[in-house]
């Protein structure tokens, strides 16, 4: 369940940030794309290191560390506005990439090690299901929250980005990332409960 929540919160970013960079901040598509590459680059660098550390020190510390970083990222995104320096976005996105790298490898290890050898295929398919379910939930939930927040701020129903009204978008974006923060907190709590159950 924690993985579903984290993948959902990740897709909040994938849905909202392109609007922020290209429409609100008026950055070119190529520049916005380069900025968004920070996340996968940190994943590429961090995931192998996370897997190595999982084998050395166990999954617990890394999982909690990754979730804490993801909570911090959602909070940082909440404070983005029209005047935020680009380096602030880059740092927040780098933390998100590192947090995901720290969380996913040990979380996968815990899932795969919790089943018998003959059930590894089922466990692997459940991991894939959690990822895809999180993506679907993230896309549906983030767009709903974004446009609801924008509609409330604008006083009329909004179903797309409003040209020349980035202030309205910022309101919806902040509400969206607040919910993303709550999802990360819920994932953190569920992980604590899972660890308590397995250590008894």
List the model feature ranges, each with a label.
Residues 151-162:
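Peri-membrane helix termini and adjoining interfacial loops of integral membrane proteins
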Residues 161-164, 194-200:
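Intrinsic disorder in cytosolic terminal tails and internal cytosolic loops
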Residues 1-149, 173-191:
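12-transmembrane solute porter fold
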Residues 163-174:
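Membrane-interface segments at the starts/ends of alpha-helical transmembrane spans
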